[in-house]
Curated annotation (Swiss-Prot):
Its cofactor is Mg(2+). This is Probable molybdenum cofactor guanylyltransferase. HAMAP family: MobA. The gene is mobA. It comes from Methanosarcina acetivorans (strain ATCC 35395 / DSM 2834 / JCM 12185 / C2A). GTP binds at residues 20-22, 33, 88, 117. It is an enzyme of class 2 (transferase). One of its GO terms (cellular component) is cytoplasm. One of its GO terms (biological process) is Mo-molybdopterin cofactor biosynthetic process. It catalyses: Mo-molybdopterin + GTP + H(+) = Mo-molybdopterin guanine dinucleotide + diphosphate. InterPro entries: MobA-like_NTP_Trfase (IPR025877), Molybde_CF_guanTrfase (IPR013482), Nucleotide-diphossugar_trans (IPR029044).
């Protein structure tokens, strides 16, 4: 699906986003979490609206053609935007395979990566991460007190592809393994991010209906499974 976004052939200085939507939603009865609807919009629609404030294209990483077909009706609401799909080629490799497939599909040097069940991704924070990553290998949020990270809410350069291949060759699939193998990663402290998003809703993901209720209040009767 393409639109007004003008991207030259090959790699450009544009910004891409990779949305990892291939999860099976086991904790929600195998539903497509990206299609959960509350307050009149699906999670995917909310996510795309936020991302397109700061990126030129979005790549949806999905598991197969049937899942792609389920998501297509949402994409029809974005006729003038560049949205493409990519598919895993390795089975049971987790989100790292989705990132690999997305980076291969991306037309940009830098891509923001997030999960498909994150309805409140903050475009200002995505913009901040792109600015921090510029000229480096990646920009990764870090919880400074306990040294934990947000690898599925980060900006990565194409340099990560080589490290991902090395990770798979070593029979590992942790997202942080190739991140730490890169030499020039910028860590963005959560305290700085909190200055933009005090409640840190940008990191929130949906695993259960209760998660939605806790984030936006009672939505009983509004959630369509």
């Amino acid at each position: 699906m393409s639109g007004k976004t003008e991207l030259k052939p090959g790699r450009t200085k544009s910004r891409s986003a990779i949305v990892l939507a291939g999860g099976r939603g086991r904790r929600m009865g195998m539903v497509e979490k990206a299609l959960l609807e509350f307050e009149g919009k699906t999670i995917l629609e909310r996510l795309l609206e936020n991302l397109f404030r700061v990126v030129d294209e979005v790549i949806l990483s999905v598991r197969d053609i049937p899942q792609k077909e389920k998501l297509l009706p949402v994409l029809e609401k974005f006729p003038d935007r560049e949205i493409r799909f990519c598919f895993d080629s390795r089975e049971d490799a987790g989100p790292l395979e989705g990132i690999r497939a997305g980076l291969l599909e991306s037309r940009s040097e830098y891509s923001f990566v997030c999960a498909g069940d994150m309805p409140f991704v903050n475009s200002e924070i995505v913009d901040l991460l792109f600015e921090k990553a510029n000229g480096h290998d990646a920009a990764l949020p870090r919880w400074e007190e306990d040294r934990m990270y947000e690898p599925l809410h980060a900006v990565y350069s194409r340099k990560m592809l080589l490290e991902i291949e090395k990770t798979f060759e070593g029979e590992r699939n942790s997202v942080l393994t190739p991140v730490f193998a890169m030499k020039d990663v910028v860590f963005v402290e959560v305290s700085e991010i909190r200055g933009i998003d005090p409640e840190l809703r940008t990191f929130a993901n949906i695993n259960t209906v209760e998660d939605i209720e806790s984030m936006i209040g009672s939505v009983v009767g509004k959630v369509e499974l």
